[in-house]
Amino acid sequence: MGSISLPEKHHAVCIPYPAQGHINPMLKLAKILHHKGFHITFVNTEFNHKRLLKSRGPDALNGLPDFQFKTIPDGLPPSDVDATQDIPSLCESTTTRCLDPFRNLLAELNGPSSSQVPPVSCIVSDGVMSFTLEAAAELGVPEILFWTTSACGFLGYMHYAKLIEKGLTPLKDASYLSNGYLEQSLDWIPGMKDIRLKDLPSFLRTTNPDDYMVKFVLQETERAKKASAIILNTFQELEDDVINALSAILPPIYTIGPLQFLQKEVKDERLSVLGSNLWKEEPECLDWLDSKDPNSVVYVNFGSITVMTPGQLVEFAWGLANSKQTFLWIIRPDLVSGDSAILPPEFLEETKDRGLLASWCPQEQVLSHPAIGGFLTHSGWNSTLESICSGVPMICWPFFAEQQTNCWFCCTKWYNGLEIDNNVKRDEVESLVTELMVGEKGMDMKKKALEWKNKAEEAAKSSGGSSYSNLEKVVQVLLSK
């Protein structure tokens, strides 16, 4: 991935939505653009900047002369430094309060105090931080929107307006959540024939005609049409029909994933220390995995936002215990809503020789470890794609947003996943974990997962890979003025 020889250094400002699952892919992309010759300014919120310093150490965000970290406020009142922020509040705050601080930051970057820094020449913004388009237009620079969802999740959001128009949402009353209404199949969304209403991004399951998240999705998908281009962390071969459907209704769309494979070309050691985990990682997990047989461990991690009830936690625990499989289970400090995650002492005693509990881990390294044989996941897009990159089949327990859509594609199109009922019961956990790890269906899924891994690697190859060649096109868009 040779760096382009830029006559004068171009300066890309990268601004992710301030949540873990959005910061990770944006930082990968920023490192790739830096490798391509761009000066990078990476913009975190002040809240997340503090969290990163706490989890990664006081020098973690010193950056480099041409890769700097800056902050803007998120507009929310202060909260517990280790808690995941409330998503609707954060969406409302970024939409209404972040444009002026972002404008001020751009003015500072272009001002006399930044004489050693080239002027801002392009913006790469998270797809749901579209207020930045206004600032890009004022500066007269191109802006690319990076939707960090799957293509299928993004297409689901793009159809919210049509779902409202057809009267499918908001729901008439709360009984529609459980009376079979959400099970109906839709045959009119291109690239998603026969998807059930329940498999579309979950914000539509509201009875409130003024639901904020629905309004937010409508606003962000409408503004997406104003971008110079849209990029997605996926690859053409995985979501071909969906990407073609998106391309028919939006500005140029470029699939540049999996970014974790494209990033392998970046050999700059100075960049490898720049990480993005908001929780302190426990790398001891990897030492423990080294002592396990290949394909013998179930990895359990519900991501950075999922919360569950104490009852659900206990059902997962006993399902894992009763499966008799070896497991590595990541339990965030705030995994149980409004409570601390307390596991039954009997469970801890029974599984002490075959289970390891940790609060956070370096997930890409864990998933690519030969000991991992399956992944019990919330189906967030980063986790799903990292699982695909490692050739690991999944049990899917989606929590919210487009995770349900990712789950549907895993289970019905890609054949590398099994769905677990939202109303989790230990018997189902036990039977699915057993099937995944030692059953015939599990073996078929493992084969399919390895096929997808190979296709992902092909897409990222510099010799003709679809994502690699799209990345070159993205660079050209960012260089255009």
From Swiss-Prot:
<protein>
    <recommendedName>
        <fullName>7-deoxyloganetin glucosyltransferase</fullName>
        <ecNumber>2.4.1.324</ecNumber>
    </recommendedName>
</protein>
<dbReference type="Pfam" id="PF00201">
    <property type="entry name" value="UDPGT"/>
</dbReference>
<comment type="similarity">
    <text>Belongs to the UDP-glycosyltransferase family.</text>
</comment>
<dbReference type="GO" id="GO:0080043">
    <property type="term" value="F:quercetin 3-O-glucosyltransferase activity"/>
</dbReference>
<feature type="binding site">
    <location>
        <position position="402"/>
    </location>
    <ligand>
        <name>UDP-alpha-D-glucose</name>
    </ligand>
</feature>
<feature type="binding site">
    <location>
        <position position="386"/>
    </location>
    <ligand>
        <name>UDP-alpha-D-glucose</name>
    </ligand>
</feature>
<dbReference type="GO" id="GO:0080044">
    <property type="term" value="F:quercetin 7-O-glucosyltransferase activity"/>
</dbReference>
<dbReference type="InterPro" id="IPR035595">
    <property type="entry name" value="UDP_glycos_trans_CS"/>
</dbReference>
<keyword id="KW-0808">Transferase</keyword>
<feature type="binding site">
    <location>
        <position position="363"/>
    </location>
    <ligand>
        <name>UDP-alpha-D-glucose</name>
    </ligand>
</feature>
<comment type="function">
    <text>Iridoid glucosyltransferase acting on genipin and 7-deoxyloganetin. No activity with 7-deoxyloganetic acid. Involved in geniposide biosynthesis.</text>
</comment>
<feature type="active site" description="Charge relay">
    <location>
        <position position="126"/>
    </location>
</feature>
<feature type="binding site">
    <location>
        <position position="148"/>
    </location>
    <ligand>
        <name>UDP-alpha-D-glucose</name>
    </ligand>
</feature>
<keyword id="KW-0328">Glycosyltransferase</keyword>
<feature type="binding site">
    <location>
        <position position="378"/>
    </location>
    <ligand>
        <name>UDP-alpha-D-glucose</name>
    </ligand>
</feature>
<feature type="binding site">
    <location>
        <position position="401"/>
    </location>
    <ligand>
        <name>an anthocyanidin</name>
    </ligand>
</feature>
<feature type="binding site">
    <location>
        <position position="382"/>
    </location>
    <ligand>
        <name>UDP-alpha-D-glucose</name>
    </ligand>
</feature>
<feature type="binding site">
    <location>
        <position position="381"/>
    </location>
    <ligand>
        <name>UDP-alpha-D-glucose</name>
    </ligand>
</feature>
<feature type="binding site">
    <location>
        <position position="403"/>
    </location>
    <ligand>
        <name>UDP-alpha-D-glucose</name>
    </ligand>
</feature>
<dbReference type="GO" id="GO:0035251">
    <property type="term" value="F:UDP-glucosyltransferase activity"/>
</dbReference>
<feature type="binding site">
    <location>
        <position position="22"/>
    </location>
    <ligand>
        <name>an anthocyanidin</name>
    </ligand>
</feature>
<feature type="active site" description="Proton acceptor">
    <location>
        <position position="22"/>
    </location>
</feature>
<feature type="binding site">
    <location>
        <position position="383"/>
    </location>
    <ligand>
        <name>UDP-alpha-D-glucose</name>
    </ligand>
</feature>
<dbReference type="InterPro" id="IPR002213">
    <property type="entry name" value="UDP_glucos_trans"/>
</dbReference>
